[in-house]
């Protein structure tokens, strides 16, 4: 395997939402997730990709050289996403290289945004409140039962425990992407915020969650309905959330004006708490239809400040 020269790259697609740059530390991954897109991206067979995980040759040296050159050009304080097409903590492997990579990034004043199904708690001492440590929970019920898990990584319970530990030192997040079991994910969203006598931060397992649909594979989940339900759960427990573009697209233009009016009144009791009864609300929605799309959000935010913004996109005009 040739030494890696410039391991940092600008991430494409949804990955660009996770960092200014991305970095893949390992070649291969033993976790064998059935929905993994990495083999297709890398154009290797699934058998080959899942058969091993080994550090890319010269990854630390290549990273240090690239960071030095970028610093000379004025690039500092950026965030590196670890890792789009591998896991930074592959189970059953020596992950000391991951620690070296984080140490290298920190020496040059960079921050990290980690996403794993493995155990990164051993590197918690390297992280601070400018960093993000995240885990993937796909909602598969098997992920919560170590005895029935059919693919690798920690169980859901073990991943939650790692979040609790690292949350004392850094920001934590959960990626519910792709969602395999909608109801399981909705229950898990509520578990991300737990009552605590020590205050709000101590009550949270995750500071933010990312929610995304299963792409490029069949699913019987009603994505528009699930997206609305997930937004409502996050709003009800005060959980900061982000919906990926592909799921947001499924939610867009999926409700008639009348359905939206009925939905808002059922969920927020708008008529009981304001003068905005059903007819006035329906009229306001009709009025918004005549506004430019970029002005609708500001209009709705002023009219219904308690409603999650993403729900306004669901109206079909």
Predicted feature residues:
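Conserved AdoMet/S-adenosylmethionine-binding subsite of the radical SAM
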Residues: 60-240, 244, 249
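Auxiliary Fe-S-binding modules of radical SAM enzymes
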Residues: 1-9, 184-317
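Generic alpha-helical secondary structure signal
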Residues: 39-41, 93, 137, 291
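Surface-exposed, active-site-proximal loop segments in enzymatic domains
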Residues: 45-46, 148, 255-258
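Short aromatic-enriched loop/helix-cap "lid" or pocket-rim segments at secondary-structure transitions
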Residues: 35-37, 126, 253-256
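N-terminal [4Fe-4S]-dependent radical SAM core
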Residues: 1-76
């Amino acid at each position: 395997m040739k030494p890696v020269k410039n391991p940092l790259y600008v991430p494409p697609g949804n990955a660009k939402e996770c960092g200014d740059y991305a970095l893949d530390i390992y070649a291969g991954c033993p976790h064998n997730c059935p929905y993994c897109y990495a083999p297709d991206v890398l154009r290797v067979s699934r058998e080959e990709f899942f058969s091993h995980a080994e550090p890319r040759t010269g990854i630390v040296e290549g990273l240090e050289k690239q960071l030095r050159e970028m610093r000379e050009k004025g690039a500092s304080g950026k965030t590196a996403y670890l890792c789009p097409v591998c896991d930074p903590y592959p189970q059953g492997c020596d992950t000391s290289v991951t620690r070296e990579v984080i140490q290298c990034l920190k020496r040059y004043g960079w921050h990290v945004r980690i996403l794993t199904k493995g155990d990164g708690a051993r590197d918690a001492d390297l992280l601070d409140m400018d960093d993000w440590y995240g885990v993937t929970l796909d909602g598969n019920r098997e992920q919560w039962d170590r005895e029935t898990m059919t693919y690798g990584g920690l169980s859901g319970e073990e991943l939650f425990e790692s979040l609790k530990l690292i949350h004392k030192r850094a920001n934590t997040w959960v990626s519910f992407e792709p969602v395999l079991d909608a109801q399981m994910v909705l229950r898990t969203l509520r578990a991300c915020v737990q009552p605590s006598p020590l205050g709000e931060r101590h009550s949270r397992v995750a500071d933010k969650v990312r929610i995304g649909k299963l792409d490029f594979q069949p699913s019987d989940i009603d994505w528009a309905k699930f997206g609305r339900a997930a937004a409502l759960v996050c709003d009800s427990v005060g959980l900061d959330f982000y919906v990926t573009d592909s799921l947001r697209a499924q939610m867009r233009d999926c409700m008639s004006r009348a359905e939206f009016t009925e939905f808002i009144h059922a969920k927020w009791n708008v008529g009981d708490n304001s003068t905005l009864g059903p007819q006035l609300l329906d009229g306001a929605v009709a009025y918004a239809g005549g506004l430019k799309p970029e002005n609708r959000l500001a209009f709705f935010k002023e009219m219904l400040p308690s409603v999650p913004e993403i729900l306004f996109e669901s109206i079909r005009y």
